[in-house]
């Protein structure tokens, strides 16, 4: 394990990148039937709930200096931790495939060279990121996040300043279901956050910044997706990019944002695999996960990820709830980190 500790800015940067993704924007479009007012309320409520749990999960790993799945072992024992680690690896393979699929679909919408080609391009770039390693990506991530921030501003301007009559709300999505869908995104990161907060110089502050930054950016992406569907009637991120006049620049940022986000999924899958089989090399497993995700993205259509998100919430929300109670109410299980 590298002894170098990460600073507050670095942690904020990591979770800014996690929040800016095609998947967040696409999920936001699902909330369009609620209308802007109720949709915004659902997004905010869902993210407050989800990010509070994300913060508490990150504090646990940060204080005891253990990865997400290692902290699970403290509450559920060796066998329990292996079960959740296996589930985590499986869901991260799924997320890797979904992110590659969505990114490739959007990229192909801008430059029609074939979705499978973009799947391969994104997959190869993710592997390159894994080989470089998370400790050597500082300057690259800074440039990437600055570019993604500018892109998000442009998308927001195009969507909300471009006019349009807007689509009327309907009853195809209930408010409760929308809140659950908004909660699902932060929950999907619960089994990952400790993989990063454990390396922070100031784990509690770093976790707070991570959760707040992710929450704000994720809400922003949801609103972009929902706004595009309601105001412009456009659900296709590629078409939004083209209408914004971004062209090749939009294409590059679609690919880049997909790589920087999906890298976290693959990297944490590798870390989780070490809980299952201690002899495995996390970096090698991360590469295998990326290959599997790339193949799945090529051969399997993943246009609607709602059910997958609900499944994640049903598995990991109870897990972290027990961990939170165990850590904050029954601290005797966690002597490390309390001095």
PLM features per residue range, with description:
Residues 1-38, 50, 136, 174-179, ...:
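Membrane-interface "cap" regions at the ends of multi-pass membrane proteins
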Residues 29-33, 59, 98, 102-110, ...:
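Membrane-water interface regions at transmembrane-helix termini and the short interhelical loops
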